[in-house]
Regions:
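Active-site-proximal loop->helix
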Residues: 133, 148-161
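Structural motif
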Residues: 37-38, 90-101
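N-terminal amphipathic/basic leader segments beginning at the initiator methionine
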Residues: 2-42
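Short Gly/Thr/Asp-enriched flexible loops that form oxyanion-binding sites at enzyme active sites
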Residues: 120-132
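Short beta-strand elements in bilobed, periplasmic/extracellular small-molecule ligand-binding domains
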Residues: 76-89, 162-170
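Glycine-rich phosphate/diphosphate-binding loop of Rossmann-like nucleotide-binding domains
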Residues: 51-76, 81
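A charged, well-structured terminal subsegment
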Residues: 167-209
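Short, well-structured alpha-helical segments in soluble
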Residues: 97-108, 127-130
Length: 209
């Protein structure tokens, strides 16, 4: 559509806005990083002999089956250590103070697992850090290797990037007892270190940032 523009007469004035009066606020498209509060890990026992280690099932598919193999490893290789498998009293999305209180009262350390999906791996990592930093229980989390970066991000943002963890192959769900035993008795696919060597070191060796 054509526009008709009137030509200003010689004695007319044209008002032009002062560009200096207009201010624009520009925000970074990267956003603002969240504040991270550094947390302190629990003190480690010199020995686990005669002590109780809790194996915490976070109620993901077949997690408890892998923890049974961890319990079997202790019975075979460290019979002086007592173990107890407990399942969360609620779903992994919620904190479980009742279970944590029991572990703090009766346990020397905890092994939490298994993080083997994009939502349960963060859940396992969070529960492990809760036990470490709020209840003073040395804790190692077990995850599958596909979620190592997710776990690293969660622990960093939670203020304990050095939180101890060990990895087993993916998947855990649907595997036989023999296959899960091979996971536990085998090597961490990311580090090449035996899984249970990492676990024992994780609950008995002081953490360093």
């Amino acid at each position: 559509m054509n526009k008709i523009v009137n030509t200003p007469s010689p004695d007319s004035t044209v008002s032009i806005a002062d560009a200096t009066e207009e201010k624009i606020t520009v925000l970074s498209p990267l956003g603002f990083p969240p504040k991270v509060s550094k947390k302190t890990a629990a003190a480690r026992p010199e020995s686990l002999d005669g002590k109780m280690v809790y194996l915490v099932d976070c109620r993901f598919d077949d997690s408890i089956e892998l923890l049974k193999q961890v319990q079997g490893w202790f019975a075979e290789h460290m019979p002086a250590v007592k173990t107890k498998i407990v399942s969360l009293s609620t779903t992994y999305q919620h904190d479980d103070p009742k279970t944590w209180d029991e572990i703090k009262a009766n346990g020397a350390a905890a092994i939490v697992g298994v993080g083997h999906c994009s939502t349960c791996a963060p859940g396992v990592a969070t529960h492990a850090i809760t036990l470490e930093t709020r209840y003073g229980v040395p804790t190692v989390a077990i995850h599958t290797d596909k979620f190592d970066r997710v776990v690293a991000s969660v622990t960093k943002m939670a203020g304990l990037p050095e939180a101890r963890r060990a990895f087993v192959p993916q998947p855990v769900m649907g595997k036989s007892a023999a296959e899960l035993k091979a996971y536990v008795y085998g090597k961490d696919p990311l580090t090449g270190v035996p899984v249970m060597q990492e676990v024992i070191a994780g609950i008995t060796t002081a953490l360093s940032a």
